């Protein structure tokens, strides 16, 4: 076993990586409120796991979406628990994200040289809100349908580009199958991928610059 470790150590410098991860300086002023970002990340990971589990049963069609959600809740093994955890962690993620933004703002964590960390955080906040909008529609019940109709109709007030933008969001002139397909693709592929990329950037900058000092 030692020879195997030495082989990898010689090529990858595993010990140096481990030392960098475990020996990072933590300022003495850090308290429990500095854990809000980490809790948000944990909620995101729970979302990914539970969301992936539900894709085995969910059917993104206007005729079968609601019935598939009902199947998850009433017949699939532990489906009710998985979907409930997904919903609870979604609410928790939004709450923790908001509190995290307030904490960073109130402690001046957005100031030089951490402006880009703040920018990526704002992008992540927008992505989190987008998760809520797209996920809300997926059961395709009355609440989800009318929420999508209202949200996608908002850009219609923009001069010139409003109507084309609405049609782009809906996939057609009215809310229907194309809209659900778009929102499902955004919720399960586009948004998670963008969130993972911006989270990686966010954490790498935090690792590089460290935690901001007290005011």
From Swiss-Prot:
What's a GO biological-process term for it?
photosynthesis
Required co-factor(s) are:
heme b; heme c
- Annotated membrane topology: Multi-pass membrane protein
> Mind telling me which residue stretches traverse the membrane in this protein?
32-52, 90-110, 116-136, 186-206
Q: Which InterPro entries match?
A: Cyt_b/b6_N (IPR005797), Cyt_B6_PetB (IPR023530), Cytb/b6-like_sf (IPR027387), Cytochrome_b_N_euk/bac (IPR048259), Di-haem_cyt_TM (IPR016174)
Q: Where does heme b 1 bind?
A: 100, 202
Keyword Transport recorded: yes
Q: What else is known?
A: Heme 1 (or BH or b566) is high-potential and absorbs at about 566 nm, and heme 2 (or BL or b562) is low-potential and absorbs at about 562 nm.
Q: How does it assemble?
A: The 4 large subunits of the cytochrome b6-f complex are cytochrome b6, subunit IV (17 kDa polypeptide, PetD), cytochrome f and the Rieske protein, while the 4 small subunits are PetG, PetL, PetM and PetN. The complex functions as a dimer.
Functional note: Component of the cytochrome b6-f complex, which mediates electron transfer between photosystem II (PSII) and photosystem I (PSI), cyclic electron flow around PSI, and state transitions.
This chain belongs to the protein called Cytochrome b6
Q: Which organism is it from?
A: Oenothera elata subsp. hookeri (Hooker's evening primrose)
Question: What's the name of its gene?
Answer: petB
């Amino acid at each position: 076993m030692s020879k195997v470790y030495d082989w990898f150590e010689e090529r990858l410098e595993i010990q140096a990586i481990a030392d960098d991860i475990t020996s990072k300086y933590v300022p003495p002023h850090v308290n429990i409120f500095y854990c809000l970002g980490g809790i948000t990340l944990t909620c995101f990971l729970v979302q990914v796991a539970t969301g992936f589990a539900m894709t085995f049963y969910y059917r993104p069609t206007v005729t079968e979406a609601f019935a598939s959600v009902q199947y998850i809740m009433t017949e699939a093994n532990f489906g009710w628990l998985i979907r409930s955890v997904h919903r609870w962690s979604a609410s928790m993620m939004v709450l923790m994200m908001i509190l995290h933004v307030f904490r960073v703002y109130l402690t001046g964590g957005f100031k030089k040289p951490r402006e880009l960390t703040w920018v990526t955080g704002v992008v992540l906040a927008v992505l989190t809100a987008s998760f809520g909008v797209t996920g809300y529609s997926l059961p395709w019940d009355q609440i989800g349908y009318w929420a999508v109709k209202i949200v996608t109709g908002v850009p219609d007030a923009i001069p010139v580009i409003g109507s084309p933008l609405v049609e782009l969001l809906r996939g057609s002139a009215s809310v229907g199958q194309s809209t659900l397909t778009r929102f499902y693709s955004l919720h399960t592929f586009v948004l998670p991928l963008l969130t993972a990329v911006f989270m990686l950037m966010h954490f790498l900058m935090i690792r590089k610059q460290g935690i901001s000092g007290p005011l």
